[in-house]
């Protein structure tokens, strides 16, 4: 099953509480109601925890490079891409784009 991971930050001027309200009331319900999405979850990253390698080079950053991670399990990727090309899909992305930094990255992967 295709899985999309999105790592992102909010725009500097975005109020985190306002964004979390948007997530809870608009984005999460809309994503979970879409027939082409099996599951959708978002995590807020709290802090840098530890190095991944036993002997890291240099000092760990004090702030995570991204503060949010979303995971979308997609039943039909073509249907999702098709929806995003519609007026409704464009409006949905536009409503999210108000909050997120333009360095947002979408990645596509699969379970191993």
Model-found features: residue ranges?
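Macromolecular interaction modules
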Residues: 1-112
């Amino acid at each position: 099953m295709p899985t999309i991971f999105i790592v992102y930050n909010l725009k500097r001027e975005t109020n985190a509480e306002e964004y979390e309200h948007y997530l809870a009331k608009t984005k999460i319900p809309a994503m979970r109601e879409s027939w082409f999405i099996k599951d959708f979850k978002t995590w807020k990253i709290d802090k840098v925890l530890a190095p991944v390698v036993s002997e890291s080079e240099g000092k760990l950053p004090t702030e995570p490079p991204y503060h949010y991670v979303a995971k979308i399990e997609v039943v039909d990727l073509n249907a999702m891409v098709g929806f995003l090309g519609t007026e409704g899909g464009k409006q949905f992305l536009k409503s999210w784009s108000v909050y997120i930094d333009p360095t947002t990255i979408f990645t596509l992967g699969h379970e191993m």
